[in-house]
Amino acid sequence: MILRRTLPRLASAKDGSGGGFADGHFPSLRGHPAARANARDAAEKQAALAAKEEEIRDHRRGDAAAASPAPSTVKEFRVYRWSPDAPSRRPHLQSYHVDLATCGPMVLDVLQKIKAEHDATLAFRRSCREGICGSCSMCIDGVNTVACLRPVDTDTSSATTVTPLPHMYVVRDLVVDLTSFYQQYKSVEPWLKRKTKTKTETTEHAQSPEERKRLDGLYECILCACCSAACPSYWWNAEAFLGPAALLHAYRWVSDSRDEYAAERVQALAEGWDKLYRCRMIKSCTATCPKSLDPAAAISAMKTLHQLGKP
């Protein structure tokens, strides 16, 4: 009797019984541990080779990214220039290129960097740098605002244009003459006026919380002149019309419960109509106010008080 030895079947990739490939790649003979070990070693080497190739591709991608230039942070600023020392030279816009990566976030920071590092002759007002004093008011990209509260537009593909407040006489560069503006502010008598005399100068004039709340949105004005410089009615009648800023302060004292001249204040503003009624409710003042106040509403309220005859 002749005994015939049969060959073992190929292990299945799924269950190890039947034809196929073990580990999904290489054939394995059931009952031969060495063959299975060799298949596992080959699969591990192939996986290691694939990982190495992916690492090389990542390295090449990183080199390509490093070779490409970084986005530029240099931005152009076009600043209005005019000097009384050279009256024959026409006003013009001068370009300065500033690296935003080495500068503060506000337009005032840019102007100070230009003055310190690029051109010491540039003239502009500034003081508090916190939106309190109103000194650095100017027109930035067509909008009247204070430079210390205006963030820099980080889009380096377009230039930022900085000019003086419109409809103001220019003293030099970004500095305008505010003499008439302050005279109009003074004309509304922006101080407490009393008919009842107090016993001593140190006597306090008490207010209820409700009376004090009526002053919110009025006393915060910083006299930056952005609203008046944006008002077409003020452009056309600068000598007669007091402008939004002065009228806002006038209403602040009309609304103050401690003041005893409210009726006289309203009547003085309404005389001749030009001081108060030249306002056409265009509301450019409200739109441009950097402190988010509403001078147009204050002017409208004073017109109503005058018409009703009861401030």
UniProtKB/Swiss-Prot annotation:
Q: Which residues bind [4Fe-4S] cluster?
A: C221, C224, C227, C289
Give the enzyme's main class according to its UniProt record, as a single word: oxidoreductase
Cite the record's Basic and acidic residues compositional bias ranges: 51-63
- Annotated catalysed reactions: a quinone + succinate = fumarate + a quinol
**Residues reported to bind [3Fe-4S] cluster:** C231, C279, C285
Keywords noted in UniProt: 2Fe-2S, 3Fe-4S, 4Fe-4S, Electron transport, Iron, Iron-sulfur, Membrane, Metal-binding, Mitochondrion, Mitochondrion inner membrane, Oxidoreductase, Transit peptide, Transport, Tricarboxylic acid cycle
What Pfam families does its record include? Answer: Fer2_3, Fer4_8
| Predominant subcellular localization, coarse grouping | mitochondrion
Once renumbered to this chain, the transit peptide range reads 1-63
Q: Paste the cofactor note.
A: Binds 1 [2Fe-2S] cluster.
Annotated pathway = Carbohydrate metabolism; tricarboxylic acid cycle; fumarate from succinate (eukaryal route): step 1/1
Residue ranges occupied by any 2Fe-2S ferredoxin-type domain in the UniProt entry: 77-168
Annotated region described as Disordered, given as residue ranges: 1-70
Subunit (UniProt): Component of complex II composed of eight subunits in plants: four classical SDH subunits SDH1, SDH2, SDH3 and SDH4 (a flavoprotein (FP), an iron-sulfur protein (IP), and a cytochrome b composed of a large and a small subunit.), as well as four subunits unknown in mitochondria from bacteria and heterotrophic eukaryotes.
User: What's the family?
Assistant: Belongs to the succinate dehydrogenase/fumarate reductase iron-sulfur protein family.
Q: Tell me what this protein is called.
A: Succinate dehydrogenase [ubiquinone] iron-sulfur subunit 2, mitochondrial
From the UniProt record, report the name of the gene that encodes this protein: SDH2-2
